[in-house]
Amino acid sequence: MAVTALSAGYNSFGPPVLGASGVLTTGDVYFVDSGSSQASDGNAATDQKAPAATWDGAIAKCTANNGDVIFLMPGHSETVTTAIAMDVAGVRVIGLGWGRSIPAITPSGTIDCVNVTAANCVIENVRFIGAAASVTAQINVAGDDFTGHKLVIQQDAVPLIGVTIAGADRFHFSDCLFLGTAAGPDVGIDIEAGDSSDWVVEDCVFNYVGSTGLDLAGIRASKQQTGGLVKNCDFIGMNVTAIDINSSVSALSDGMIVGCNIAAIASVANIDTLIDAGGYILVENHGSDLPAEAGGLVPVATPA
């Protein structure tokens, strides 16, 4: 049973008490802090005064499905040249801090910055910085039941695709910012392999004004997607299409897109083209291609 030391010399038996973070776990807790003079991946990293130096170094200390938590400390930063392998199931990575003090990860090289191959992993409150060349994605998700929450997925000239989904089911992105900062980005989230079922993307912002538009789609799927939900997302600076799930063709509804707002970066012939829904139901989505004009329903057609 875990023991948490309190300031007056008391001990708390049971789940570790992690300050005011609201995180309870019976697993092990590890700290990562590039700003610490004592940082080393050779440390046990269970004490914030002797943390690991890298995210990947902390992952190597975790036990699968043990409820382990990794805290990336405020101001932590890494330049990643070999993909961070989230290959231990059930690990939760939490970035501490707010604003630009949240942990910042910069990929360099022909890599996916983080490669999630294990199931039930979580990443929260981390900023992924774009690059000038080579990087293929900020996060690749191949493990089922992945959660990404309050992430900043930045795309400069690369990566062309912010997040790739490689056959994972039940992934969930919430309250994330996908941000274009230089010309080049093609897609925010690309579901690139097979039918990823029962996934959710909600309360996210896809903002590509800073990249003079997003070339292909905020969310794109190349295969049929069953049970997907896109909810309450804002798409700003779309060149062509905000959501492209045209490979889903079920007449009975494969999923739903609801409550989304879309701003095209240039005039389009028909705002209906801002969503290519395939077999997805559309409910109360709005789009516009001109400033100072009210957005119209997408699609314009209403049910008979």
Regions found by a protein language model. Give the residues of each.
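Right-handed parallel beta-helix/beta-solenoid
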Residues: A2-G57, G287-A292, P303-A304
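Predominantly polar beta-repeat domains that present long G/T/S/D/N-rich surfaces used to bind, process
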Residues: V3, Y10-N11, G228-A304
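Glycine-rich repeat segments that build the extracellular carbohydrate-interaction surface of secreted
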Residues: Y30-G35, A53-T79, V91-W98
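Short, T/G/N/S-enriched strand-turn elements that build extracellular solenoid repeat scaffolds
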Residues: W55-A64, E78-V88, P103-I105, I111-T117, ...
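All-beta strand scaffolds that present successive hydrophobic residues in beta-strands
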Residues: L72, R92-G95, A118-E124, F146-K150, ...
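Right-handed parallel beta-helix/beta-spiral solenoid domain characteristic of secreted/periplasmic
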Residues: G90-I139, K150, D156, G180-A182, ...
